[in-house]
Amino acid sequence: MVWPARMAMLERARYHLTIWQARSGQVLARQERDPSSFPPAPPALDGTRYDVVVVGGQPEGVAAAVSAARQGVKVLLVEKRDGLGGLFTYGWLNFIDMNYGPKQELLTRGTFLDFYRQVGGSVFDVAVAKKVFRDMVERYPNLALSLNTAFKEPIMEGGRITGIKAVREGQEITFYADRFIDATQDAVVAAAAGVPYTVGAEDMGEPERRQAVTLVFHLGNIDWGALEQAVKEGRIKDAKISDRAAWGFADVGAAYQPSTPRLRLRGLNIGRQNDGTILINALQIFGVDGLSEVSKAEAMELAQKELPAITAFLRERLPGFGGAKLLGAAPELYVRETRHIKALYQLDLNDVLFNRYFPDAIALGSYPVDVQATSPQDTGYVYGRPEVYSIPFRSLVPQGVDNLLVVGRSAGYTHLAAGSARVVPIGMATGDAAGVAAAYSLKVNKTFRDLAADRADIKEIQDLLVKAGAYLKDYQIKNPLENHWAFNGLKFVNRWGLIVAGYNNDWKLDAPVNQASFYYMTANALKRAAGRGDLVAAKAAVLKPYLQREPLTRGNAARLLLTYLGEDAAALDPAAAVARAAAKGLLPVDKTGSDPQGIVTGAEAYYATERLCALVGKI
């Protein structure tokens, strides 16, 4: 039930061929007070108090700080680096993952749209982006900025943060506030404050499973015209090019042989800089703990050593690269995933792929659920492509701390939902929401938890967001599958990452299932959803004969299911096995018939997998 790795790579490349041009519908003008009318914020000195403190100068943090400042409150933005922009300006990710609606209207507006317009589109010059972020912040006199300031720890009183300790120029300093926003990549403030969280795919029972990290590298002396001609003449498969970017190139990446299996060159995302040089996002590094500075430093060294060989390979492989020169690499790695905080609501894959609109929606997204490779044994999977889904305010509100919001990729998303929700434009939209909510909560003197529970307060926050330029349309997208008899089973296997629907959302409900696919589906479901890896291990030898790529009959499906329930199913004839499994509610024979030689389809397999886990949970 999983696409072959090669197909996944090609489909990912083809998808990106279709979304190059910026395509926005009518955008409402922002209703904003003159920033000069705001009382200035005090300078970032030790012991200073603010209304709102934002930790993290990532794009999401800039959005949060600017959004709060637009509401007239006094804000401090704390950033450990010497500038703003984080992943965009220090990880050199200069190729934006855009989110469009059904009519190609831009979904992520507000501060992101401001940034997008000022940098000139979805591919930008890193130096320009860094300046744009700085200019955004400096526009507001009530927004103070403290660079080169590393968060150290929160000051807690019960379930509230009253201040933070930070280090600047070797000296410890303290800032106080009534509201805090964690916009760090790894939710470091939330974690230090005691907010519970999972790491990587821990919420699926696989804590060591994390998406590959990437080192973006910098090449010069590129003949862009020669590359453009080759792409447009079709001499390079699955590639697309404009005056600012080129992408695809799946065959090129696949042809490179790295010096170690911990590295892989995937399809190339190439973004031009204003000086004609290029940045390439393609080099994947496996086995990296994004929460360990030692692990990241080792990964950086490993990747940097590989870059001369990659450059030489591209010189030989790509038109226009014959004289390519390696100019360096990003100062930081592109880490796609570390923590996922536990929030009042955990956005999951079904919410994303079935286009859920929440009553407390504060941002919209549509980016495909693109989970990058987690090991050298896979190339990553596109679990599906939503039309439009929403992020609920509750997913920004962490459990256990009353006056903190978390924005960006480490907010309240499951591992799989984050495959879409992690992208920066969505993160900046959540930053806008956090800034507005922080200011509003001060006005009404309510905690974020209280706001989340009050529909009237949420409506006020949504209205303020729209006035500030956000886009929160309820598309009321109907799901044609919700009346299907196997829909609960489909949602179950989808929630646990047991099927891969691809860019076309092919759920394979009517497709025949083979024995091996059903074995792995049920085994992984028991491990991930029921926490019964012990049961899977205990039955592995007995079920080994099912590891065959041949059609799955209903009789064999029944035997496998009954084996997990502790029965000697091998002794049953196929018809008796089907009858017994049906009696236990494992097989929907009223929908599919009871022929033991009938071939099981996806719908029946999903139904059976969900029912198996439900029964095992009662053993």
Each PLM stretch: what is its role?
Residues 16-20, 456-619:
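N-terminal propeptides
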Residues 1-52, 131, 145-146:
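Extreme N-terminal leader/targeting segments of oxidoreductases
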Residues 29-42, 376-410, 451-486, 491:
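Extended, non-globular alpha-helical segments
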Residues 32, 41-49, 67, 73-74, ...:
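Conserved N-terminal/central alpha/beta ligand/cofactor-binding core
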